[in-house]
UniProtKB/Swiss-Prot annotation:
It comes from Gallus gallus (Chicken). One of its GO terms (biological process) is regulation of transcription by RNA polymerase II. It is found in: Nucleus. GO terms for molecular function: DNA-binding transcription activator activity, RNA polymerase II-specific; RNA polymerase II cis-regulatory region sequence-specific DNA binding; zinc ion binding. SUPFAM superfamilies: beta-beta-alpha zinc fingers. PROSITE patterns: ZINC_FINGER_C2H2_1 (PS00028), ZINC_FINGER_C2H2_2 (PS50157). Transcription factor that binds specifically to the RAS-responsive elements (RRE) of gene promoters. Belongs to the krueppel C2H2-type zinc-finger protein family. Pfam families: zf-C2H2, zf-C2H2_6. Residues 15-28, 535-549, 1123-1132 have a biased composition (Polar residues). Keywords: DNA-binding, Metal-binding, Nucleus, Repeat, Transcription, Transcription regulation, Zinc, Zinc-finger. This is Ras-responsive element-binding protein 1.
């Protein structure tokens, strides 16, 4: 009945019970629902145990008794014997038993409220520490505090009605709060009907029964109310009637039925400039008592209380105006009206005199506020001066000028009543930037905000867009700058993309995120694209627009639907009007900066920019007013502005919280958003952080193992990733690739990876010429690599290079490819599809990449067909002296740079005379390539260029460095692209026409292997062989990453062999193939380690960037032991199968080799082993194999350029791409090199894989396959291949059942055997070739070896090709090789090693989207996004990107990535002596034994530098025959097409000791025989090669796939 009205003074029921003494029995009133059940339990004279029926006299006894039941059970799981709930500890269980006994042993000494725990009581006691009368009047709690308040002790909300709807616990606690205030005031309970005073609530309740007929009904309109408070408010708001005492005076401040305090005003911030006005209107509508002893702002006229003096003054003015209005009514007949001009002026401002307002005074006040708020809602996305009064209180007249319908603006009475009856219970949040945000808050939260339905009703008639009048109509004085703006109250949308909400977000979150502050009113459609014109855009629009597009759309980016666009001056003025301090505030930027563009205009712009339909773009762009950057999110802009102002980038936009890092900020933001992304799959309990969810699973569901816990945690991707992106502070975000590096220092280090120029590495080691970006890195290098240097002399070994001289050389060529080279300080930004804002050069004509070419769905292949149509439109300065003009569009500049390549100009200073002369000859060809940091153009599987990351080139950045934050565009979020990291689209650069290739190919041999073996998807790849030849050749056109002319020549020959490719490509790649250039580069390049078959991803481009390939990352993340079951085998089977099921040469493996390998294996005694399908390593755990598998993809890539000079073959076979084509080549083309390839030990293959990896860049294997370095072949002929049986252990290769008569090799298929025999025959034919066509051989070799290499690759098992530097390299060039190598390696090494320190542990921001489930491998490579289990794995992997080789051989100064590689290499030095002494037999035996070791060790770590290990070994063996190399090279000219691979075999022979049966006779020749052998080697049976070709063609698709990755081309020599 009426007792609810009296709850004002109640103390919580649970406060009335003591621990052991029962409270006096009471008769609860019918509607007292507080703890009714609890009370009845307390009233009982006895308490019964639910388990054993024992009767206890007190609750405490019952508690102690039921606790004994728990100990009786003796369980260790701490589960409740009554309800079975499992708790974490015995103490928690004891505390839990209070729930069943009902005892609340801890009681507040002030208010009597009782609690189950001491901590809860003490927390409660804090509310009594201050005088409650002084707590609330002047300092409404902050939104966060108020939110916390609501759950624990909700102060009286506006309506008793609301309290009745709340849960009993909350209501009771709330009542207790009222009681506190009242009792301190007058310790009495008042009857709201007769105003009698009572000393206890029970007396009051009894008294209320004497008023049974007192119905709460309005006397005027007969509306009935459930609570007295509701009636009071109704009378005050509707009828302007205030409660009055018997004398007729307003009776508010002493009326106990009126709520005390102003806590309800917590919906807005008291620091808000409009707070006095808001509080005045609100307190006039909602009667409140002032409970402060000191700050009592009470109106003497109407007895209303206000929280602050200013609100009271505003209120008293209304009384004065009322009086004035009464006088005015009396005088209205005689007095003339005010000046009509003045009235018109006031009306134009949306103002009128209050005396002209209708008598319903308070309602009109509310009406003003409502109108103001509605205008805010309507104009929230309009640029304006935040807080400018002219725009805030727009009259209908002004609103009409703004394009809004007249009818929308004047609020109707219904709307006013909606708000006045429930003032702001679910109200607006008025933002400091004049925008309004609406978010429904659940009843439990303290800040009750606007009901969505109300707002929808009010905003329903709003036009989709209300455009701003020209700025001149807006007041130009920054009114709000006088005030310190309040921080935004409403949880902002966490700076998530406004137009996209993750589908998995729970519904409340969706509405919360969509209602973005100051952006979009809930009922309005998202505003269309807004493009802000930059001061520079006008000059660059012609360059930015598509050739076919008209310039008008691009030059008029400031399209507005209904008003004239702002001029640049107006925009500048508008931005300048904002004070700096506003930049601190989250929201005030949005309204000023945004401009509307209709969807039609947007389509016109897009249609103009791209000839085909483009996917949807971001709707809004936000320019920075301090620099020229443009952002797609206001949150990103705010974060960016903080960086201008030196404020922490990780500052909460909602409150004052400043996080130390982004992760802490994200966790904090969840407290505002309510987001709980970690969900228990069993009971759907959500957690804000994973640890909470894990604890929940352990405690509640008894999940103890990590596997069970992980399995039952679901991560709901709502907006965390977008939050991350939005909070990317531009001072930590890479502008070129969008990567957020978390720290500015890491960003600086990272930026070096984009500027591949030597000038970024000013510190050079005088010993080896390696350049470093930081001096400390150079010192570290000297300490580790040059041990003879004393520490005190280190400074003398560091050369500081001045780069200014080189810039002049590089500038001109760089103009062609430098997307980011800005001569002007301001760079206009276009927004590409993938959401990264890329700057385009404002002065260099550059073809804009048609946006339509880049599908939003990354699963689609890229479509570059537009490129081939518009190539003529590309305007590029033609700087290349030797490239013909038609080919000027095809430059090295179009390819991803190889960061480890030293610049030619830089190297010129260091190269001694002889090499220098030769280099100059070649530098004519390669000069531009160096200047442009040659980027091999990788073609994707369908022949399209792989998505090349926009990487900086060696030019200086002339403008200020603009850091752009990664943006997620809506289309991206909606599609499968969420599953992989967001990648920048390739920069607008012209690319080659699409080659005539129709089939997609796997990007890497290793990927093909893994897909076929792990995912059992051979069908994915089996049909792709036919197209390989044209593809491989065309993709090889990219300049070799090592930047030498040799690579170009070999590429050219490959292209020439391919009739499908335009001849001009050949010209571009091979302008002047000359032996001199070849040798010069050979010498110059020195010892480069090859890398594995996978592309180097230093620029961060993901392998799946084009969407064409399976994600190895995802695949491995989901593999389990079962997937590897084919590779499980017992220890016995292991030795047996490794011989039989290995590669075709496995039968030759000697028992000693197997034994060695068995000893080597860490898990050799393990009962079951998992053999890596791609190398001989064996693992006891599937997880170890999974981790190791990455070494066959991206993990261990050596990022140094391969030594094109001769040490390193481009060893990847392109066979997987050309299985059919190879057989169609002239029979002679598959030379002994293929035999060698077929027979080389696994270590060889590993090395070859690595060699490729480097050259490929983001290309497929075929690219580097075609780029086989021919000089290498010529040098290899100086070496013996010691015979060795290779140990492969690859279970992917099956048994061979057919043996070759000539070499004893076995094959699985008869057809393969017959082809193999033909190869022997063909080899004989080849030997008859003369040596006079050397240059031709050199050119043609490039294509043939790579194609031939692929031919045999399928049968061969992994081989560790030990390639040794010829004397020509080791001795003739000597130091040059080291220098060139270390420089190219060093650049990559230092660039990434410095970056690695801060980056390698930091997962990319977008990683959250890259996998559907959380990947347990927490260490993520920042370059290629590969994941690793441990930091050690990642560190080792990073060396593949950086080129770091921390281990150095003291004998030959070779450097190695892995320590065990160095150890193995040092063994070679010992064995080389024996090789020289004992001749061919001992050589053979040693290499046999070492083959097992090397193949195992090298492949086990993906052999980051297998090739380098033996190079020096054989320098001695062949050291005295440099002329032999030259003569052999000449002799190869004639045999180039027939013996393309043959030449390389000898160099591998003596040197590598990784040999094969077929090469025995050759191997047995002493080193001295090698020189004459230049021609003799040509006499090998060509039938063997023919045989190999046939075998290759008939190979099964699976074998072909596996072989292509497993056995990269081995150099076979057939005697």
């Amino acid at each position: 009945m009426m007792s609810a009205v009296m709850n004002v003074g109640k103390i919580a029921e649970n406060g009335g019970t003591s621990q052991t003494v029962k409270s006096p029995s009471k008769s609860p009133a019918p509607n007292r629902i507080g703890r009714r059940n609890q009370e009845t339990k307390e009233e009982k004279s006895s308490y019964t145990c639910p388990l054993c029926e024992k009767i206890c006299t007190t609750q405490h006894q019952l508690t102690m008794h039921i606790r004994q039941h728990n100990t009786d059970t003796g369980g260790t799981d701490h589960s409740c014997s009554i309800c079975g709930k499992s708790l974490s500890s015995a103490s928690s269980l004891d505390r839990h038993m209070l729930v069943h006994s009902g005892e609340r042993p801890y009681k507040c000494s002030v208010c009597g409220q009782s609690f189950t725990t001491n901590g809860n009581m003490h927390r409660h006691m804090k509310i009594h520490e201050k005088d409650p009368n002084s707590t609330a009047s002047t300092t409404p709690p902050s939104p966060l505090k108020a939110k916390r308040l609501s759950s624990k002790r909700k102060f009286s909300q506006d309506a008793e009605m609301d309290r009745e709807e709340r849960t009993p616990a909350k209501k009771v606690v709330e009542d207790g709060q009222y009681g506190e205030g009242d009792r301190k005031e007058d310790d009495a309970y008042h009857c709201p009907v007769c105003f009698k005073d009572f000393f206890c609530k029970y007396a009051l309740e009894s008294h209320m029964e004497t008023h049974p007929d007192n119905s709460l009904r309005c006397d005027i309109c007969c509306i009935t109310f459930r609570t007295h408070r509701g009636l009071l408010r109704h009378n005050a708001v509707i009828h302007k009637q205030l409660p009055r005492d018997p004398t007729g005076k307003p009776f508010i401040q002493n009326n106990p039925s009126i709520p005390a305090g102003f806590h309800d005003l917590g919906f807005t911030d008291f620091s808000c400039r409009k707070f006095p006005r808001i509080s005045q209107v609100w307190c006039e509508t909602n009667l409140r008592r002032c409970i402060s002893e000191f700050h009592r702002f009470i109106c003497e006229t109407c007895n209303k209380a206000f929280p602050m003096l200013l609100a009271l003054k505003l209120h008293t003015e209304t009384h004065v105006m009322d009086q004035g209005r009464d006088k005015h009514k009396l005088q209205s007949t005689s007095l003339p009206s005010e000046n009509p001009d003045q009235k018109a002026f006031m009306a134009s401002l949306g103002l009128q005199y209050t005396k002209d307002i209708k008598p319903v005074k308070q309602e009109d006040d509310t009406q003003d506020e409502v109108q103001e708020m509605r205008l805010r809602a309507l104009k929230s996305n309009l640029p304006q001066e935040p807080g400018s009064t002219g725009l805030l209180s727009l009259s209908p007249l002004e609103a009409a000028t703004m394009g809004g319908p007249f009818s929308v603006l004047p609020p109707t009475k219904e709307n006013i009543k909606l708000l006045s009856l429930q003032p702001f219970q679910k109200g607006f949040i008025i933002q400091p930037d004049s925008s309004i945000v609406v978010k429904p808050i659940s009843n439990e939260s303290a800040i009750e905000l606007a009901d969505i339905q109300q707002i929808l009703k009010m905003a329903s008639s709003a036009p989709p867009q209300i455009s701003l009048p020209p700025l001149s109509k807006a007041p130009s004085v920054p009114v709000q700058s006088i005030f310190k703006h309040m921080p935004p109250l409403k949880p902002k949308p966490l700076v998530t993309p406004r137009t996209v909400v993750a589908t998995s977000t729970p519904p409340p979150l969706i509405s919360a995120q969509q209602a973005s502050p100051g952006c979009i009113s809930p009922s309005l459609p998202p505003p269309p694209l807004r493009l802000i014109k930059n001061s520079v855009e006008t000059s660059s629009n012609s360059h930015l627009s598509q050739p076919g597009a008209k310039s008008s759309p691009s030059s008029q980016l400031l399209l507005q639907p209904k008003v004239e666009p702002l001029t640049q001056h107006e925009m500048k003025t508008q931005l300048e009007q904002d004070s700096i301090i506003e930049a601190l505030l989250p929201l005030n930027m949005e309204a000023k900066i945004k401009q509307e563009v209709t969807e039609g205009d947007l389509k016109a712009i897009i249609a103009g920019a791209a000839n085909k339909k483009a996917p949807t773009m971001r709707k809004v762009l936000y320019p920075c007013r301090f620099c020229d950057q443009v952002f797609a999110f206001s949150g990103v802009l705010r974060a960016h502005i903080r960086s201008h102002l030196g404020i922490s980038p990780y500052q909460c936009n909602i409150c004052d919280y400043i996080a130390a890092d982004k992760a802490a900020l994200i966790r904090h933001l969840r407290t505002h958003s309510g987001e709980r992304p970690y969900i228990c799959k069993i009971c759907h309990y959500p957690g804000t952080v994973k640890a909470n969810c894990e604890r929940h699973l352990r405690k509640k569901h008894l999940k103890v193992t990590r596997k069970d816990i992980e399995k039952n945690i679901e991560y709901v991707t709502s907006n965390a990733a977008e939050m991350v992106d939005a909070f990317c502070s531009p001072d930590t975000v890479c502008k070129l690739c969008g990567e957020d590096l978390k720290h500015y220092r890491a960003l600086r280090i990272h930026m070096r990876t984009h500027s591949g120029c030597q000038k970024k590495k000013p510190f050079e080691c005088k010993e080896c010429g390696t350049a470093f970006s930081a001096k400390r890195n150079c010192i570290h290098h000297i300490l580790k690599q040059h041990l003879h240097v004393q520490e005190r002399e280190i400074e003398n070994y560091i050369l500081v290079v001045d780069c200014s001289a080189q810039e002049s050389h590089t500038d001109a060529p760089l103009l062609e490819d430098s997307t980011y080279m800005d001569c002007k300080p301001i760079t206009p930004f276009l927004e590409p599809q993938n959401g990264f804002l890329l700057g385009t050069s404002s002065h260099v004509p550059i073809k804009l990449e048609p946006m339509g070419n880049f599908p939003m769905d990354f699963d689609e292949p890229l479509d570059f067909s537009q490129k081939s149509k518009n190539l003529s439109a590309v305007q590029v300065k033609q700087e290349n002296l030797l490239v013909s003009s038609p080919l000027s569009f095809y430059d090295c500049s179009m390819e991803p740079i190889d960061l480890s390549i030293p610049k030619v100009l830089k190297r010129d200073n260091d190269i001694p005379g002889e090499a220098r002369n030769q280099e100059l000859a070649s530098s004519v060809i390669t000069d531009n390539a160096y200047n442009w940091q040659q980027c091999p153009l990788g073609f994707g599987a369908n022949g399209n260029s792989e998505k090349n990351r926009a990487v900086g080139h060696p030019q200086p950045l002339k403008g200020s460095l603009h850091l752009t934050v990664p943006i997620i565009s809506p289309a991206l979020l909606g599609n499968s692209a969420l599953l992989r990291p967001l990648r920048p689209k390739p920069p607008p650069q012209p690319l080659l026409p699409k080659p005539p290739v129709t089939k997609e190919l796997p990007p890497l041999a290793s990927i093909a292997q893994i897909i076929s073996s792990v995912s059992s998807a051979p069908a994915l790849l089996k049909t792709e062989a036919a197209d390989a030849s044209p593809k491989a050749a065309s993709s090889s056109t990219g300049c070799d990453k090592s930047g030498n002319a040799k690579a170009k020549m070999t590429i050219v020959t490959a292209i020439q062999r391919d009739s499908n490719l335009p001849s001009d490509l050949t010209q571009a790649c091979d302008p002047e193939p000359s032996p001199i250039a070849d040798t010069g580069l050979t010498k110059k390049r020195g010892r480069k380690k090859g890398t594995k078959n996978k592309p180097k991803l230093s620029s961060g481009v993901d392998l799946e960037s084009s969407g064409e390939f399976a994600s190895i990352e995802k695949m491995l993340a989901t593999t389990d032991t079962n997937k590897f079951s084919p590779f499980l085998q017992s220890t016995d089977n292991f030795k047996e199968e490794s011989g039989q099921n290995g590669t075709s040469e496995d039968e030759k493996e000697t028992p000693e080799d197997k034994l060695l390998r068995g000893k080597r294996n860490t898990y050799s005694d393990c009962p079951q082993k998992i053999t890596c399908p791609y190398c001989p390593r064996v693992f006891s755990w599937a997880s170890s194999l999974q981790r190791h598998m990455l070494t066959h993809t991206d993990s261990q890539a050596d990022t140094e350029a391969p030594a094109t000079g001769g040490e390193v073959l481009d060893l990847t076979s392109c066979e997987k791409e050309q299985p059919e084509e190879v057989s169609e080549l002239p029979g002679s083309e598959c030379s002994p090199q293929e035999e060698q390839k077929a027979d080389s030990p696994p270590a060889e293959e590993d090395a070859e894989e690595k060699a490729d990896e480097y050259e490929e860049g983001p290309e497929e294997d075929s690219v580097s396959n075609k780029s086989l370095d021919l000089n290498f072949a010529s040098k290899l002929m100086d070496f013996k291949l010691a015979e060795s049986d290779q140990s492969a252990g690859s279970s992917s290769q099956t048994e061979r059942k057919h043996a070759c008569d000539v070499c004893g090799k076995t094959f699985k298929f008869a057809g393969a055997l017959s082809r193999h025999k033909k190869a022997h025959i063909r080899e004989d034919r080849k030997d008859e070739r003369s040596s006079e066509d050397e240059s031709k051989s050199i050119q043609d070799d490039a294509g043939a070896p790579s194609m031939q290499d692929s031919g045999l690759e399928q049968e061969e098992s992994p081989m560790d090709l030990k390639v040794v530097e010829s004397p020509l390299d080791c001795e003739a060039t000597g130091k040059e090789n080291e220098e060139s190598e270390s420089i190219s390696e060093g650049e990559g090494t230092e660039r990434k090693s410095t970056e690695k320190s801060s980056d390698d542990k930091i997962p990319k921001t977008d990683e959250a989207k890259s996998t559907a489930k959380a990947d347990k491998r927490k260490k993520v490579c920042t370059v290629c996004n590969k994941r690793f289990w441990s930091l050690q794995d990642l560190t080792r992997h990073m060396r593949s990107h950086t080129g770091e080789r921390p281990y150095k051989c003291q004998t030959c100064e070779r450097t190695f990535t892995l320590k065990h590689s160095l150890v193995r290499h040092q063994r070679i030095h010992q064995k080389v002596k024996n090789t020289r002494n004992h001749g061919k037999e001992s050589d053979k035996e040693e290499t046999q034994s070492r083959c097992g070791e090397d193949s195992e060790n090298e492949s086990s770590h993906s052999g980051t530098n297998p090739i380098s290990e033996n190079e020096c070994d054989f320098a001695g063996v062949v050291g005295s025959h440099p002329s032999g190399t030259r003569s052999r090279k000449e002799s190869l000219v004639g045999a180039a097409k027939d013996v393309p691979c043959e030449e390389e075999r000898p160099s591998g022979q003596g040197a590598t000791a990784d040999l094969v049966e077929p090469a025995k006779s050759t191997q047995k020749q002493p080193a001295k025989d090698q020189e004459p052998r230049g021609s003799s080697e040509l006499e090998r049976p060509s039938g063997f090669i023919q045989d190999l070709l046939e075998m290759h063609n008939k190979k099964s698709p699976m074998n072909h796939i596996l072989a292509s990755a497993d056995s990269t081309p081995q150099l076979l020599g057939v005697e």
